[in-house]
Amino acid sequence: MRGVARSPAARLRRRALIGALAVLAALPGVPGAVGASGEGTAQEAVATNFELIGHSPLDNRGMNAALAVHGDYAYVGSRTDGKPWGTELNLNDAGIKVVNISNPASPTVVGEIGPPDQGLTDQTSREMRVWSEQELLIVQNLSSNCSELIHYCSPTGGTPDVFDFYDISGENASAPKKIATYDPSSNPHEFFLWLDPFVPGRALIFISATSAGRLLVTDISGAREGQFRELGSWSVPIPSGDLHSMGISNDGMRAYLAHLTGGFAVADTSDFVEDLPGATGRLITPAARRVSWPGPGAHSAVKLFGKDYAFLADEVYGDALAAPAFNPPHGCPWGWVRMIDIADPTTPALAAEYKLPQNEAAFCDTDPPRPSTSISAHNPTLTPNLALITWHSGGFQAIDISDPAKPVSAGAFVPDPLPAVVQEDPALSAGADKIVMWSFPVIKDGLIYVVDVRNGLYILRYTGPHAEEVSSIEFLEGNSNLGDALRFEPPDPCLRSTPPPGTVCP
């Protein structure tokens, strides 16, 4: 595997470290051991309407992050950077794990993209997608958002936030080969991969430049030739918060903005899709009519397939990020889900909320402080009638959204945690709560792939209400319009000012 060769001595040191951690985790009073912090645990292990098919602990490294799946392989990024221990870099395995999933019951780590490409000091691989038609793995590397407090990361300010593109065709699937790098004009935070449903080979990435409050849109169609063209950078005119992320309609004409404390709004992104000179975005929802609530605010926004509703999720960390040190404050009761009626996108309205019991204020009144626990909604992937969402220490949740105004529980999966890992997440798993379901779920061939920050990659089968919807899916993820997304909500070519050639419009 490129960039990951280690000496026998280094491998022995790492095995010894994991073994020592396993022993320490069983001892009372040891920092980071289960039950040692005085915090209560969030949930017992449960599997309601989920069947565990396979699991990889990803070498017990901890600090796992983004997930991308293609063919017989899954790729798992890291929330932290590569730490130099002694004279060797990346002994905490902070690169991108390559996992063979040809047998979903036995996923196996077969390599890692490490130095000099990944797993560097001051670099985290927290966002990834696969452009399947081009067989390209897209890795968004973050440095500007690298912090000791949240990511156990060592910010130096010298590493740029870039997108790396890896060829994963043929033999490169198990040993990805870097072929191009794109350095955006603004530091990225998250991105949505959009493939033009009417122009084969055309792909855009919609980037939330959170620190700049901007939406940056870039044409990556020429990625294999190292060609990238920024179509526009729009300063979102919402007076508070920052653009954290956005969902994009299948036709690319609308964006559903998660603007942290600024809340939720709908935007027109047709300029970028039609590649107009001076392309920019425009708010369809006037800023004064946006839906907002107390911070930290909107983290993820996804439109429901075939329904005039948007699914909003917060992300809220533990009490260590509470007031007065942090504004807006984090902590109990953390974050949950809101269903927004967008039948009139100029005046969206809150239709319903969905919470776990731990997200009720009454729970906080009786619960001990949890400085490094988050029982918060995070990243969703939707089918027409289900929301599959990671909920940090609340595990992995299925929500029936067939009636968007009345979302109800459809299942939950909370595994037993690993005894020990190389690196606990300082903000999410350093206390007693050792489950941290984090990634966007990816559905491939009817099975669900999801990553826990601490405990690795899980492969699940959903067996609850609307199970046939999930089992029929070839590919679906919450942060692109790839695969079955187009089947669930076919785009209308006649909405473009210049419809594609051969289109017959009324």
Protein language model annotation of sequence segments:
Residues 1-6:
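Compositionally biased, low-complexity flexible segments
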Residues 7-36:
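Secretory targeting and sorting signals
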Residues 21-24, 34-506:
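Feature marking well-ordered beta-strand scaffolds used for ligand recognition
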